[in-house]
Every structure is written in C-alpha cells, then in structure tokens.
C-alpha cells in the first residue's frame, strides 16, 4: 500500500498545471450567457491538464494498463462533452449528455466488476431511482428517457467505483478511495445540473457544479496511477517512463 504522504510527494507536482488551470477558470469566470471557443477552451483546460497528468506517467504505462487507458479515453470524451455544454442553450445539451454517458461507461469498465459488491449496488440503485423520481416531473419528451438512461449509467459507474472501497485493514488502497470519492462528486455535480435545468434554480449552481466536477475528474484520474490490474507485484508510484 502506498501512503498518502508518498502520493502527495509523487503526484502533487504533476497536478500543479491542473490546479492552475482550474484557478484560471474560476478567476476569469466567463459568462455562460455568451458561449465562445475561448470559454470552451478555458472550461476544458483543466481536463486537458489531466490528460497530461496521465501521460506524464509514460505512454508505456497507459498501454500496459487497460484501466488507466480507459480513464484517459474517458477524460477525452469528458472534454468533448464540456465543449458541447458550453452551447447547451443552442441545442447541444444532448450531445454533451451523450459524451459524458460514454465517459461513464469507460470509467465503469476501468473500475472493473470485481468485487461485485451487490449490497453496494442495491443501495446506489435505490438512491438513483429516488433521484430520477425527483427529476421526473420536470422531464418531458426525449429527456424523459435520456435522463433515465444517463442516471442508470452514472449510477453504474458509481457502483463500480465504490465496490472495491475498503477504508480499514491491510487491503486499503488510496486509489480506491480516490475512485469512490470522484464518483460521488461526479454524481453530485450532475445531480445539481439536472435539478437546476429541470426542476428549480439551485443557488450558486455553476460554482457548485464546476468545483465538484473538477474535483471528481482529478480524483478519477488519480485513481489510475496505481493500476488495478495485477502485474507481478503491486504497481507503485515509482514506476514512470
């Protein structure tokens, strides 16, 4: 098991560009009412930095570990989804929804199906059903089905992220904690989007959505550093190209 102190020392410097790009987004705070390619670039920049964060561990690392590669591709789809959502009021919300749906499928595949953790899945399934029931009165047309499918996909991703989470004992791994925390924050971010769009105005919605979203993506990217595939001895942070 890698200690949190080792994680901070090893991975912290690689995340500096991400933190700087996130600060740029919040400092500039470009108005969402005036979408442009500049605002799309500023919004996507932190995700681009997470691409670089994973690439900093070496292309051979990504090629050797399918879970890390899946998370990287998921980040690519997320950036495309972010760009689409810049123009969501111009008919591109569904496009963004599709991109993030694909990202969640990729993340779920990266987290794997072992252990199964059926009880965790049942709890998440019930909670996601309640969330959809809350959203349902505000949905109409195709969104009635699109949002339902999206809720199912992000809930499945959350289940797989938290299935292997162990907080005590020798089997504890910080990467599983990062995956579980990232999934929870992603669900919170997207639930806020849905409530704000379909149900009622959420105070400070944009700040809440983007802060939880960037934190979620960072944690999910961080979870890829220690591979989930057994390759001889456990993969350690010292491995780099």
Curated annotation (Swiss-Prot):
It is a multi-pass membrane protein. It catalyses: a 1-O-(1Z-alkenyl)-sn-glycero-3-phosphocholine + H2O = a 2,3-saturated aldehyde + sn-glycerol 3-phosphocholine; a 1-O-(1Z-alkenyl)-sn-glycero-3-phosphoethanolamine + H2O = a 2,3-saturated aldehyde + sn-glycero-3-phosphoethanolamine. The keyword Transmembrane applies. Its main location: endoplasmic reticulum. Changing residue 190 to V: Reduced lysoplasmalogenase activity. Keywords: Endoplasmic reticulum, Hydrolase, Lipid metabolism, Membrane, Transmembrane, Transmembrane helix. Its EC number is 3.3.2.2. Disruption phenotype: Adipocyte-specific knockout mice show elevated levels of lysoplasmalogens in adipose tissue and enhanced PKA-signaling pathway and mitochondrial oxidative metabolism in adipose tissue. One of its GO terms (biological process) is lipid metabolic process. GO terms for cellular component: endoplasmic reticulum membrane. It holds the Pfam family YhhN. Residues 31-36, 88-96, 137-142, 196-206 are extracellular. It is found in: Endoplasmic reticulum membrane. Induction: Sterol-inducible in the macrophages and the induction is mediated by the liver X receptor (LXR). Up-regulated by high-fat diet in the white adipose tissue. InterPro entries: TMEM86B-like. The chain crosses the membrane at residues 14-30, 37-59, 68-87, 97-113, 120-136, 143-159, 177-195, 207-225. Residues 1-13, 60-67, 114-119, 160-176, 226-241 are cytoplasmic. Highly expressed in the jejunum, white adipose tissue, kidney and macrophages. Catalyzes the hydrolysis of the vinyl ether bond of choline or ethanolamine lysoplasmalogens, forming fatty aldehyde and glycerophosphocholine or glycerophosphoethanolamine, respectively and is specific for the sn-2-deacylated (lyso) form of plasmalogen. Plays an important role in lysoplasmalogen metabolism in the adipocyte tissue and macrophages. Belongs to the TMEM86 family. This is Lysoplasmalogenase TMEM86A. It comes from Mus musculus (Mouse). The gene is Tmem86a.
